[in-house]
């Protein structure tokens, strides 16, 4: 089996590719199937978020596999009003929803409850099968995540 152990800082020409959803691109140890049918194992540093276009390599530097962000079921909000888009980001972020933010557009994993909430704000929500590249904060490693005990001595409100 091919073991992919590093993400290249300067991508090389890919010899293969692998199409992965976000839920797999956040894992550091996982078995995957390359697009050519070969099995491979990801043995990557913990906390590494793979993006579409990243190139992974084996330890020997003889195989170069390009990551392709898989099409996923996402809700899509398009809006030309920055205030309304900010309002949507606020409410989705307050619910810790992994969110892809682009100029005039938001994407999140399809959820009819969230769709209905945003429609109540007057936004148009559609559905699509599209690549999903959420902000890294939604998938931060534990050492950088959002956690603390209630006995911590600082204010924090939602």
Curated annotation (Swiss-Prot):
Ni(2+) 1 binds at residue 96. Disulfide bonds: none annotated. The keyword S-adenosyl-L-methionine does not apply. Binds 2 Ni ions per subunit. GO terms for biological process: protein folding; protein-containing complex assembly; urea metabolic process. The artificial UreEF fusion protein binds nickel but is not able to transfer it to the apoprotein, thus its function is impaired. UreF function seems largely unaltered in the fusion. Belongs to the UreE family. Homodimer. Dimerization is prevented in the UreEF fusion protein. This is Urease accessory protein UreE. It comes from Klebsiella aerogenes.
């Amino acid at each position: 089996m091919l073991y992919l152990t590093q993400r290249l800082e300067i991508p090389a020409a890919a010899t293969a590719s692998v199409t992965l959803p976000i839920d797999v691109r956040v894992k550091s140890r996982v078995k995957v199937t390359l697009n050519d049918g070969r099995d491979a194992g990801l043995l990557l540093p913990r906390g590494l978020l793979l993006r579409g276009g990243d190139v992974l390599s084996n330890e020997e530097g003889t195989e170069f596999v390009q990551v392709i962000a898989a099409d996923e079921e996402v809700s899509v909000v398009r809006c030309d009003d920055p205030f309304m888009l900010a309002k949507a980001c606020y409410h989705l972020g307050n619910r810790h929803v992994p969110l892809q933010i682009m100029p005039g557009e938001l994407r999140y994993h399809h959820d009819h409850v969230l769709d209905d909430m945003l429609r109540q704000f007057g936004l148009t929500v559609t559905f699509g099968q599209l690549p999903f590249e959420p902000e890294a904060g939604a998938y931060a490693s534990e050492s950088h995540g959002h956690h603390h005990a209630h006995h911590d001595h600082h204010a924090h409100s939602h």
